[in-house]
Amino acid sequence: AFQEVQKKKWDSPYRDWFHLSFDGDTEYHDGFWYEGWEGHNELVKLNLWNPAVIEHQFNAIRSWVERFGIDGLRLDVAYCLPPEYLKRLRAFAQGLKPDFVLMGETLHGDYNRWMGPELCHSVTNYECYKGLWSSFNSRNMFEIGHSLARQFGPEQWTLYKGAHLLSFLDNHDVD
């Protein structure tokens, strides 16, 4: 779709699939400006408010469920996805398969913004990454103890009581 926009510009039927303007340019000199993910123009940002984009994505998910029997998705950079989009995605996926799981990658902030009954089932627990690493590598249990108490402790104010976060020791983003 984006190559079609590069070729036909404003005459492309996909021009509304992306955040772009024909009044500017990028470092790639395509003859128009477009928004990239977190400033990376090689990763062109999709317009998730466009019904045609959502339909295209949902059709792809439907085909993966039918052809391969997938029962979940890991959403890279889920923190960039609007909650309204996540709600639509969850409703669609569970309509295909009631036990379909959405796992979102989140870095910082309140994970409840991306996780809940209508959003992702779970998200990555970057807050505990360093504490887990320290507990295994330097026997420092304070960091992980503090983070886990803050997230799941017995107090009423804990952040994620009853939630299931994906904690990890290593991944491709922390090497």
Regions found by a protein language model. Give the residues of each.
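Substrate-binding/active-site clefts of carbohydrate-active enzymes
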Residues: 1-62, 67, 92-95, 112-113, ...
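Active-site-proximal helices and loops of the catalytic beta/alpha 8
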Residues: 2-9, 62, 66, 76-160, ...
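Generic secondary-structure boundary/loop-capping signal
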Residues: 14-15, 40-45, 121-123, 129-133, ...
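Active-site-adjacent bridging/hinge elements
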Residues: 33-34, 59, 163-170
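The substrate-binding groove and active-site-proximal loops of carbohydrate-active enzymes
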Residues: 39-54, 71-80, 132-142, 171-175
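Short loop/turn motifs at secondary-structure junctions
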Residues: 68-69, 168
